């Protein structure tokens, strides 16, 4: 059996439980074909680089698959028939990644506070130790 990574994008107007149901249906196709799905990752609702079938966003899902090629072809056929699937990409790999994918790692990095957020330090413009430089308004010469 060969190892595959499959990423698919589902329509933006379906709910997260519907995406999970779709993922389970695709996993069942693989298991019925004699393979197994070792990892299922839901990457969330993300922007698409360009409009695909009138959608600007999509639910991204990653599957790590260990299956014969016939099962993978059947899964790809079912995805092409399904209206909820916008795009798919299935590639054959030498070995499957253990742990979270790069997308999930970057997602956890985005959860950290950004630089300057959450600091208790005073900001430069909030310093009270500097004297205020109030000056009188300028007058135009020869006007009044």
From Swiss-Prot:
It comes from the Bacteria. GO terms for molecular function: small ribosomal subunit rRNA binding; structural constituent of ribosome. Keywords: Ribonucleoprotein, Ribosomal protein, RNA-binding, rRNA-binding. Residues 95-144 are annotated as: Disordered. Gene3D superfamilies: 3.30.70.60. GO terms for cellular component: cytosolic small ribosomal subunit. One of its GO terms (biological process) is translation. InterPro entries: Ribosomal_bS6, Ribosomal_bS6_sf, Ribosomal_S6_plastid/chlpt, Transl_elong_EF1B/ribsomal_bS6. Residues 107-144 have a biased composition (Basic and acidic residues). Binds together with bS18 to 16S ribosomal RNA. Belongs to the bacterial ribosomal protein bS6 family. This is Small ribosomal subunit protein bS6. It comes from Paramagnetospirillum magneticum (strain ATCC 700264 / AMB-1) (Magnetospirillum magneticum). The gene is rpsF.
